[in-house]
Amino acid sequence: NDEGHMAKNQWVSAENEISYDSPDSPDGGSWLYFGKDGKIVTAKWMSINGKTYYFDEDGLMQTGLLELDGQTYYLGEEDDGARKTGWILLETITKDTDDEDIWCYFDTEGRLIVNQMDRKIDNGYYTFIDGKMQTGWVLMPSKSDVTDSNAASPRITDYQYYGAAGDGKRAEGFRSIEGLSGIHAADEVYTFYFKAGKPYVSDKKGNSLFTINAKKYAFSDLGIMQTGRQIANVANDEIANFYFGEDGIVKTGKQTIYNEETGETENWFFHTDGDKKGQGYHGLRDGILYVYGKRQDATADQRYAPADL
């Protein structure tokens, strides 16, 4: 330095040779660091007062994004230099306003997570593509290598859901959200149920039954939770009538259902237990005839009316 003393464990400005004794750290400009042997630290990582810095071959402290040995690191802004870990908003790194709500994650060694599916971070799972945390409906990488020219129609089973912008946590349980472009109607909100990010989807055309927390629900082949009176697939490749509440839970026993097509209120009965629980009752019950769940009533001027069983 100017006084002729050997600099040890000191930051020194590359521009004006101002020196700082540790534990002070640099504040703007280009900085060098002299180790305990009085030599400039070059081409290596250096831990200084609990923070990690990287110095290039000329000994200059690096800032911003650093590409090194096939890995990407973030060393803060020009007045910082300390290696970062954890969540970093991409806009902070690039200064690009188009990167709003896009997050990156740097592991405990400061390495950017580039392409990884369902990485566990704290209490959630996240997917990263090209270093960016994914949100919303995400086509899984194993499915996305099919080119547009030979790709079949998109299927909801090729996707997982990762929360809204700024969230990114893999979905679990019920979510009322917009559907998938090209699969569902635009701007419509539907209710789905997710397990490990994947929606419950009927594996047959139409609706199929699923048990969630000991309750029965029906989901379509597009993954949509069903409400009201619906037809669903049952065992032996058969179908049956069911009635679901607004919460999607199957209803049993006597039910009064409004028929929007006829404008009339109808009386139905659905099995209350057993393997057929929830299915429309077919046959005589307490002297009343039900056909696939719907009560059959003769008109006011009839004592008897034909019914097909």
Region roles according to the model:
Residues 1-309:
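Extracellular adhesion/carbohydrate-binding repeat motifs centered on closely spaced tryptophans
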